[in-house]
Design a protein with these regions (language model features):
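N-terminal helix-turn-helix DNA-binding core of bacterial DNA-binding proteins
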Residues: 2-39
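Short, contiguous hydrophobic alpha-helices characteristic of membrane insertion segments
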Residues: 1-2, 57, 103-104
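Beta-hairpin "wing" of winged helix-turn-helix
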Residues: 51-62, 69
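Amphipathic alpha-helical dimerization/coiled-coil segments
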Residues: 79-107
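Basic, amphipathic "hinge/linker" alpha-helix immediately C-terminal to the N-terminal HTH DNA-binding motif
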Residues: 63-82
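Short linear capping/connector segments at secondary-structure termini
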Residues: 29, 61-64
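Basic amphipathic alpha-helical segments that dock to polyanions
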Residues: 43-53
Length: 107
């Protein structure tokens, strides 16, 4: 596992679920999830860290707006983290997960 914070992993997940999101799109989603305002001074340095570590690429949407895309390295990190997380979820909790909570039906 890489040395990512929980906040950075949450950003990766958000970026993976959106189509070339702009920084403001990512900010809107993370604020919804956390239920609080996220300051730009927290968001953008963490996005830059994800770019520097090769998990995300940053491109220009227009002259003032950046967009973010997950790299293969970022996809691998998400898969590894989800696999690790899943290994610690008790079977009785796994059995209760449905399409609406996980995206797939479990037995």
């Amino acid at each position: 596992m890489n040395d990512l914070t929980g906040f950075q992993r949450d950003l990766l997940l958000i970026i993976s679920g959106l189509d070339e999101p702009k920084g403001l799109d990512v900010n809107e989603e993370i604020e919804k999830y956390y239920g609080t305002e996220i300051q730009h001074g927290r968001l953008y340095p963490n996005l830059d860290t994800l770019v520097e570590k090769g998990f995300v690429t940053k491109g220009q949407h227009d002259l003032r707006t950046n967009m973010y895309m997950l790299t293969n390295h970022g996809k691998d990190e998400i898969k590894a983290h989800l696999s690790w997380t899943w290994s610690y979820i008790p079977d009785e909790l796994k059995a209760g997960l449905t399409d609406s909570t996980l995206g797939t039906q479990t037995q």
